Amino acid sequence: MIDRPNDALTLTLPDGSTRTVPYGTLPRDVVASIGAGLLRAALAVEVNGTVQDLVTPLRTGGTFRVLTERDAKALDVLRHSAAHVLATAVRRLRPQAKIGFGPAIEDGFYYDFEVDEPFTPEDLAAFEAEMRKVVAEKYPFVREEVNRQEAERRFVDDPLKLERLAELGDDEIISVYTDGPFVDLCRGPHVPDTSRIKHFKLMHTAPAYWRGDERRQQLQRIYGTAWFTKEELDAYLHRLEEARRRDHRVLGKELDLFSTDQRVGAGLILWHPRGAIVRNEIETFERELILRHGYELVYTPHVVNEKLFEISGHLVNFAENMFGPIEVEGTNYRPKPMNCPGHICIYQSHQRSYRDLPLRFAEFGTVYRYERSGVLHGMLRVRGFTQDDAHVFCTPEQVPEEIARLLELVDEMLTVFGYPYTIELSTRPENALGTPEVWERAERTLAQVLEARGQAYTIDAGGGAFYGPKLDFKLIDAIGRKWQGPTVQLDFNLPERFGLEYIGADNAAHRPVMLHRVLVGSMERFVGGLIEHYAGAFPLWLAPEQLRVIPITDEVRDAAAAVAARAKEAGLRVLLDDRAQTLNYRIAEAERLKTPYMAVIGKREVEAGTVALREHRLGRTQKPQILGVDELLARLTHEVATRALPGAHGPAAGSGAQAAAD
């Protein structure tokens, strides 16, 4: 509840004590009353879950927490402030540059500028040096609240700012921040002064359309990163270098996994034979898993009468992400962006009884979503992708058990791929369908199931889908990055919109609850993420080529061919490399393609009935293992059958892969 100007505000501190202060008190005064040392360390505060800086007047009471460098939420404040320091530096060196906006983003910040010529690497170096001068000058971030006329006067030479001002409602507070001579239209929050921004680096520049609209002017966006310590900055730069080494677009080409072709269309993936093997293995594994968990497979069309999406609400709430209509015989059809309406139609094809529930429909369904060309990114951001969609139709009483089953399914799936994960509970967005009461009930149900299982989670306020709250699983890859993973969504709205029913034990009609879930989500994105997670060196069960048999000389070729034939009969994907190339060349070729195992066979191995086994993961300097052919095949087939992670030579470690919540 927003307090009135004449109200006293009650603030509850983390230790349970309270402070009563007048409306409009500055947070820094509250922090000072707690302790001078805390004030020196304070960067911002959090009031009722909302972060604000130390100079924004308090307008509401509630929980009050001081943010210091030790708090993850303070990092966004630091980075937003670094964006302002960047704009200050650019304005000093390029006074004619028109300023856009500069938010904090994951791992850093950016700022948009309208300039006559694109920025160069030399420009970035000069801007970064100037930023260090601004930091050294220790300018305080001074906040002012101004009326519209004063704001327009201050930004008369900045048309991008004037455009934003024109959109603000009459009752909105207009605030500006200055650091030294630079002034910016901004809501904050900011750190107390520029000297707090010590460890930063400008990364690169790229064109960006104003407000992401390709019909608008193109700006120059400068990206940067900022951290509280030099060690954190250095570690981040190292991760970036490692990420470049793992880039799925580069590895996808080197390993011949996938490609795109402008003749096919932007954002549409062509799966090559080697990539198709990886995808097929994942789908086969997941199909076995979900059938064991009680799902039934279904298929729905790629193109659907758009009236179905009017009923579902997608045409109103998701239209900008849908492809345009295709008119056929007076009826408009759309490439489907979602599989759920089709599954609902299957549910409604029969009268359902409570004895039929829960019903669990699953589909590897290809969907199509419009993305601007500027945001397309390899396999990670595409326009057509296959989604492992499933929908559970159940009674309200069955919801907790079904969610618990889904959590077990997700954990079993992710453990096989070696992903730790965190869970976010995403709550009601602004464009939500349904009443707040329905949403609160759904959110409470998800939270209660997580808490009953002892699973840690964080809240992503406003991050739910328009038809229901969801659990988002964030996968943590080998270099610590987070990826979008499985989702579980609780939906009371679509059953209402479609009029779904089942006949209860009382012989009356009742409304079922619908659960949406994906495990890998977009198959394209998941495989792209796996390529980077494994750096292209897939576990044996996923590897396009599992074993390469290499005869040292022509004299042992037939014996090597016999080993390759036995491996193929055992179900392994094997290649016999008997080319007239040197042994080192052929080993290097297998290493380049990240083939997990190489069986090198010479005269000595033929006589002993053995192979010299090399593992890709052990590198070029390893000493080969001498194994009998039977032992080799037993080991590799066991590793495939158990879907072992590299180096395990057995089943993947058990469940419990959830990482600590942030």
Q: What is the meaning of each model-derived region?
A:
Residues M1-G100, E106, D112-D662:
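NTP/phosphate- and nucleic-acid-binding module
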